[in-house]
Amino acid sequence: MPLLSGKGNKFKVDPPKIRIEKVTIERPAPPKPKPKPAARPSLSSSARSSPARRLSPKASSGSALSSASSRAKSSSPYPSSADERRLDLQRKRKALSASQRRSPASDRIEFDKDSDAEDDGWMDLDSHKRQRKATSESKSVDSNRKLKSAKAFERKDERLQFIHAVDVASLEHKCVPIMGASKEDVAIELQYPTLQRREKFELVWGKDKIDAVEASIRIVRLVAETYLTDAEAEPFTNQNNGFIRRLEKASNRNIQDLMGFKAALREYNETLLALVEDGVVSKNLDNLHDLPPHLAAFILDQIYDRTVAPKVELLSKYENGTDYVYGELLHPFITKLLVEQTKMTSDQVFVDLGSGVGNVVLQAALEIGCESWGCEMMENACNLAEAQEKEFHARCLLWGLEPGEVHLERGDFRKNSSIHDALKRADVVLVNNKAFTSQLNEDLIRMFLDLKSGCKIISLKSFVADSKSSHNINDVGSTILEVEECTYPEGYVSWTNAGGQYYISTRK
């Protein structure tokens, strides 16, 4: 009974509470703020166009750059009412966040998931620039390193021979057209940041073949971030109508705008050539003393894809348990070893004992600019190394870069007099001795007696006996070497995805 009487009392109080409904009835007022964002589009639109206005009076390329920029603006393919709606949406987005500093990707039109991936590319562009700045600040710059190849900017070498992408990935190689192209429309050409010939590609797809679309976009991005100042790169990197953005948009799987892609690439070629002819790129290279690791890796991959990859089966014919086992240390590992840990400079000497197809020898010559030696005794690997070296010199000229001297020797390094002479001058020696027999490792220790004091030896097996072993009393390695054990992470070697140990020994 008390509960019932209590309930009755509550019913008498409730009715006035229900009348609070009045508040919800009078809430049509909030729509009034809608006009506020509409007042900002003119502000964001002027902000969007201002970088282009800053560019024309700034760049040393003068009229060539300003005219190229205007060409890029006037060539947006297929204008339509849908484009106007998208631009209106973009202006509204910018208005909503005008008071905040935005990331390069924040104002972009979203088409689908692929567009999100494209925006990741823009983030990559900025991250590479930040990485390059951070790298240059964290390491000592080799002021003696001269990156520029003067020959690349003097005149076009009509006799320059290199392997075009079309020579390994084309309709003739049973690839199929992409982006809805007919067989007559697949051909494209790409300008490098020098006066040299353009590379020929075909817009085709084939398993394990060069991807012309991806390669084109990466090359444009690398040129913009390495060879040009921010102002000079504006026609390339502009978020709305830059060459990179237009190429990514046109190649989007849901758009597949062949003519738009080719138009953007054609304008990129013309704009870059104008900058090269006006001396802008050459001047910028004069001010650089170190090569970004990701650019070096890309160039080396270009070489490998055109020389080794088509014949890679030749490297699988060697037996485990012998000194004739093939394996590669990958680009990030070599950068860590030569740039970060041993801090090599362009006036030093590098030697790779068992150099395979020459990957590390070429990377040292390109990324460090040092004198670089290698010796290999497997015939197939030697043949591929020679092919890589030939393409290496041509590619360096295309990119306008001057590498260090490259010397690739054939035969047993224990019996090669040129290698023995190079070892006496060496500052860093690499020995991928993971699969070497114990006899060969013992022979190497005796060779190290001729190394100069302070020379660094990088190996995957230690040349010093275990300190717990009773056999280290007369061990030559422990007498002449001080050893540091290190660990490399996943993805640093070709034969396994797992990490492992390596050793840096210093000649006493």
List where the protein language model places each region.
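Conserved class I S-adenosyl-L-methionine
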Residues: 346-356
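Domain-level detector for long C-terminal conserved domains
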Residues: 381-508
